[in-house]
């Protein structure tokens, strides 16, 4: 992120969220982390509008985010989690055909924030899923089916929560009559610049979907994953562009 101190503050909020057993406190810390990321992104967007010159660090970029090793099971659920977080932070994604990595397109500060949130939430997702499976409540559904359904529901709920926090931060930034017009213009310019960058840079073909019919369905695991997502210590788009290239084995 352009300001390492801001990224450190976001990381501190995430650590506080992970360290409390109080669900309401955890939600407050996670939402605060997302609002801080959004507010910082807005401030930088406004600053770019008024900057006479631009550096590479102030322009949209592309970054590769590693999700997992080829052949690993459940990678789609990890991709969905990252995609939901990315969408809440104005980052667009192309997904490798084997779901082992994601190309993230966005401004550096937004990709940094997305990665920090993902690093915290993916641990929580796996931990809460393991705890659910350990109870045996998913039986007779196969464990892998239950895990996939749990984690898909977790990612979808978290993405929704982060999107809400983002909208709250944007509304707060655009309510001041003195600064609202300039802020709205900066956000619109940012949206257009990111869209143009994505169109120039992306080589995606086809679409990517998190869920597959062959994976099976478990309503109980979905409900459990949704509950865990609601309680996660702080999406997703159902379809994302699929990258043409696969990660080399």
Identify the role of each PLM range.
Residues 3-4, 42-249:
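Extended, helix-rich structural scaffolds rather than catalytic motifs
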């Amino acid at each position: 992120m352009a300001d390492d101190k801001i990224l450190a503050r976001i990381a501190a909020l995430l650590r506080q969220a992970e360290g409390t057993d109080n669900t309401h406190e955890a939600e407050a810390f996670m939402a605060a982390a997302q609002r801080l990321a959004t507010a910082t992104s807005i401030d930088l967007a406004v600053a770019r509008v008024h900057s006479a010159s631009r550096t590479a660090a102030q322009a949209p970029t592309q970054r590769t985010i590693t999700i997992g090793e080829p052949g690993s099971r459940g990678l789609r659920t990890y991709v969905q989690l990252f995609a939901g977080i990315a969408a809440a932070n104005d980052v667009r994604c192309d997904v490798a055909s084997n779901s082992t990595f994601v190309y993230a397109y966005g401004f550096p500060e937004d990709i940094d924030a997305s990665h920090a949130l993902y690093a915290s939430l993916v641990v929580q997702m796996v931990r809460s899923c393991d705890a659910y499976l350990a109870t045996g409540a998913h039986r007779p559904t196969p464990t892998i089916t239950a895990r996939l359904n749990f984690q898909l529901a977790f990612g979808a709920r978290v993405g929704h929560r982060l999107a809400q926090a983002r909208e709250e931060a944007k509304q707060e930034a655009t309510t001041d009559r003195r600064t609202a017009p300039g802020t709205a213009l900066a956000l619109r310019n940012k949206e257009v610049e990111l869209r143009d960058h994505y169109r120039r840079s992306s080589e995606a073909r086809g679409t990517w979907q998190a869920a597959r019919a062959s994976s099976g369905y478990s309503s109980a695991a979905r409900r459990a994953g949704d509950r865990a997502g609601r309680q996660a210590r702080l999406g997703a788009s159902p379809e994302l562009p699929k990258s043409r290239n696969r990660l080399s084995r």
